[in-house]
Amino acid sequence: MKKLFNQVLVAAGVLALLAGCASEEENVIMAPLPIVKSEFTPKTLWSASVGDGVGHYFSKLAPDYAYDKVFVASRDGVVKALDPQNGKVIWTTDLEIEGSARLSGGITAAFGKLFIGSENGVVNALDAETGEPLWASAIEGEVLAAPAADNNIVIVNTSRGALIALNQEDGAQKWTISTEVPNLTLRGDSRPTAVAGGVFWGTPSGRLAAAIAERGQLIWQQPVGQPKGATEIDRLVDVDASPLVIGGTLFTVGFNGQLIAIDLRSGQPIWKRNYSSATDMATDGSRLYLVTDKDHLVAVDTRSGTELWSNTQLEHRLLTAPKMIDDYLVVGDAEGYLHWIDRNSGEFIAQQLVNDSGFAVGPLALNDGYVIVTRNGQIKKLTIQQ
């Protein structure tokens, strides 16, 4: 019954990505679970929990590892630091004051602090050692993606098209860059990428933008997709994926747009390929791995943009962003399965049912295993046993 219920809800889950226009629905069918002969069985090293998780809400609230701690959070405001060796709680902080904290963008660990944004338009800073709340800064719009941290500032991308830099010491706003927001957008935003003195991010209007991080000066904007089609949904062109940087090349992908490689300094495209996605990518340097809007897994050569393989067997299973664990590519799905895929061929290596509440985000890699967080707030550290 649970499996059938999830399949019925797939169309609703896809439409929940939209910020409006509920009348233009499209029925989709979740692909049946592939039959996989697993080459290994992941072993659970420890288990824990954090609040009620993120529930059925859209969320990119993901765990982070820093300062020899695993940091996790729930939508309602519970934040924990866990010992990565045994899962024991080092500290717990509850950011709920009046009603749910609605945490949604994070976790980012930097400067000895944790930074977490919320749907309430608040960026919270906590002491990473003690969990003590240090400051909370009210900003313009929801924070649906993790902040970036660089050069003593914290940079957040908001649902209202504002890229905002905050002083990491006290949360004071240093600068704001505003970009156009169409009437209808996907639910979600691009996590900024800060590198080489610049900050790069995707916009709801289908562009990749670049600015000087120190003073918030816009340098260039490159179209990733152009609105086209008869309906508002057809014309969605959000760039919600976090830009990836490899050497002097920047990579991003847009919904109803393109996968594009861009010269970091000039902002000029090197190559473009027709892929549609609103999910973060992964890379091993020579290949890009992405999940398309149909939940197809694709590997692309970073130098030429040539497709190396494609796996369509998880279509519409509401996959997480792909993560690299050891020699494998790993994604979670809406029914709570983890799928291990050969990075060279795209073939399934292993499969495991972890928790039927499903996954909103993929696993966090550690040196001696990886941590997964399910939608209902269950946390497990797993390791691969051949």
Curated annotation (Swiss-Prot):
GO terms under biological process: Gram-negative-bacterium-type cell outer membrane assembly; protein insertion into membrane
Membrane topology: Lipid-anchor
Keywords from the UniProt entry: Cell outer membrane, Lipoprotein, Membrane, Palmitate, Signal
One cellular-component annotation, GO: cell outer membrane
UniProt keyword annotation of Transport present: no
SMART domains referenced in this protein's UniProt entry, alphabetically: PQQ
Lipid attachment residues per UniProt (S-diacylglycerol cysteine): C21
Residue positions of covalent lipid attachment, annotated as N-palmitoyl cysteine: C21
Signal sequence, start to end: 1-20
Compartment annotation: Cell outer membrane
InterPro entries to which the protein is assigned, alphabetical: BamB, PQQ_b-propeller_rpt, PQQ_rpt_dom, Quinoprotein_ADH-like_sf, WD40/YVTN_repeat-like_dom_sf
UniProt keyword Signal present: yes
Domain of life of the organism encoding this protein: Bacteria
UniProt xrefs under SUPFAM superfamilies: Quinoprotein alcohol dehydrogenase-like
PANTHER family per the UniProt record, alphabetical: CELL SURFACE PROTEIN, OUTER MEMBRANE PROTEIN ASSEMBLY FACTOR BAMB
Annotated function: Part of the outer membrane protein assembly complex, which is involved in assembly and insertion of beta-barrel proteins into the outer membrane.
Family named by the database record: Belongs to the BamB family.
Self-association state and partner proteins as the record states: Part of the Bam complex.
NCBIfam families reported for this sequence: assembly_YfgL, PRK11138.1
Name of the protein in its database record: Outer membrane protein assembly factor BamB
Organism: Vibrio cholerae serotype O1 (strain ATCC 39315 / El Tor Inaba N16961)
Gene name as annotated: bamB
